[in-house]
Curated annotation (Swiss-Prot):
Primary gene name: GBGT1
PANTHER family: GLOBOSIDE ALPHA-1,3-N-ACETYLGALACTOSAMINYLTRANSFERASE 1, GLYCOSYLTRANSFERASE-RELATED
Topology feature Cytoplasmic, residues: 1-5
Broad class of the protein's primary localization: Golgi
Protein source organism: Homo sapiens (Human)
Protein name per the record: Globoside alpha-1,3-N-acetylgalactosaminyltransferase 1
Binding-site residues for Mn(2+), renumbered to this chain: D206, D208
The protein's Enzyme Commission number: 2.4.1.-
UniProt xrefs under SUPFAM superfamilies: Nucleotide-diphospho-sugar transferases
Binding annotation for substrate: F116, A117, V118, G119, K120, Y121, D206, V207, D208, H228, P229, S230, Y231
Keywords, in A-Z order: Glycoprotein, Glycosyltransferase, Golgi apparatus, Manganese, Membrane, Metal-binding, Signal-anchor, Transferase, Transmembrane, Transmembrane helix
Molecular function GO terms recorded: globoside alpha-N-acetylgalactosaminyltransferase activity; metal ion binding
Annotated compartments: Golgi apparatus membrane
Family classification: Belongs to the glycosyltransferase 6 family.
Domain remarks: The conserved DXD motif is involved in cofactor binding. The manganese ion interacts with the beta-phosphate group of UDP and may also have a role in catalysis.
Length: 347
């Protein structure tokens, strides 16, 4: 009797277990399952919207009493790589070209270039363009803007794919100083009317120069300046700044970081617009007072860079002079001015 009851109990347990297993399989495979947000630890994340504070633009630097940075601070063969305001100083060996190519190439950037070829300076257009096609921003979209008083003199240099050239007529002036002083105005107006829709970055270069080695995306930045080849190893008291207090380009003996060349500057197109417009307004203020700065637009450029620090600085390998021997501190020359008769060109 006892054994019969035990057998019945075991049978009932087995039947109940089988029924529960079948029921679980049915529920798992046939009944719809829904997940609700409140089972998650942070259900509010689905409706969360971030409200960022508006970006605050950097303000002009007022305090300028600090030691001058020296490009050859360590030893004659080693260049400084960082400014006191943490802007990189670009030179050979400070960047990986292949890595930068992988970073910037997918962005499909368009880089603009402005040059001015007025009067006899039209003779330099061909050598400039041919060297640029060989070395400047290879593999990127490039738009050359040639400002000239003689569009017929612009040669038909073959351009690579995705590389364009626009010849833009401008008025010639009897004095080369006037042409130089009008450059900032012309560039800022061109950006406002056209270039801001066509390019991402804009470099403003001199036409009487040639590229000698690759110039690539290592030069891209918000606002870019190049150190002048004649003053990279001298104290700032010897820089040819405008020293007259009556000029808006005035720089005191205790001010200045590097002396920058007017032949090379650039950056994001919006920043270049602000920069050239600011320089133009300062030039107009001087002109209203009957003043012309010592080195014209270059004096205003240097004054502006003291108060509005460049985000990237190019070493003299990006702005050299063919009349100077290459120093041991520069491993190569990328962009250099040609040896020429200045007095003949400006006559």
């Amino acid at each position: 009797m006892h054994r019969r009851r035990l057998a019945l109990g075991l049978g009932f347990c087995l039947l109940a277990g089988t029924s529960l297993s079948v029921l679980w399989v049915y529920l798992e495979n046939w009944l719809p399952v829904s997940y609700v947000p409140y089972y998650l630890p942070c259900p509010e994340i689905f409706n969360m919207k971030l409200h960022y504070k508006r970006e605050k633009p950097l303000q002009p630097v007022v305090w300028s009493q600090y030691p001058q940075p020296k490009l050859l601070e360590h030893r004659p063969t080693q260049l400084l790589t960082l400014t006191p305001w943490l802007a990189p100083i670009v030179s050979e060996g400070t960047f990986n070209p292949e890595l930068l190519q992988h970073i910037y190439q997918p962005l499909n950037l368009t880089i603009g270039v402005t040059v001015f070829a007025v009067g006899k300076y039209t003779h330099f257009i061909q050598s400039f363009l041919e060297s640029a096609e060989e070395f400047f921003m290879r593999g990127y979209r490039v738009h050359y803007y040639i400002f000239t008083d003689n569009p017929a003199a612009v040669p038909g240099v073959p351009l690579g794919p995705h590389r364009l050239l626009s010849s833009i007529p401008i008025q010639g002036h009897s004095h080369w100083e006037e042409t130089s002083m009008r450059r900032m105005e012309t560039i800022s107006q061109h950006i406002a009317k056209r270039a801001h829709r066509e390019v991402d970055y804009l470099f403003c270069l001199d036409v009487d120069m040639v590229f000698r080695n690759p110039w690539g995306p290592e030069t891209l930045g918000d606002l870019v300046a190049a150190i002048h080849p004649s003053y990279y190893a001298v104290p700032r008291q010897q820089f040819p700044y405008e020293r007259r207090r009556v000029s808006t380009a005035f720089v005191a003996d205790s001010e200045g970081d590097f002396y920058y060349g007017g032949a090379v500057f650039g950056g994001q197109v919006a920043r270049v617009y602000e920069f050239t417009r600011g320089c133009h307004m300062a030039i107009l203020a001087d002109k209203a007072n009957g003043i012309m700065a010592a080195w014209r637009e270059e004096s205003h450029l240097n004054r502006h860079f003291i108060s509005n620090k460049p985000s990237k600085v190019l070493s003299p390998e990006y702005l050299w002079d063919d009349r100077k021997p290459q120093p041991p501190s520069l491993k190569l020359i990328r962009f250099s001015t040609l040896d020429k008769d200045i007095s003949c060109l400006r006559s």
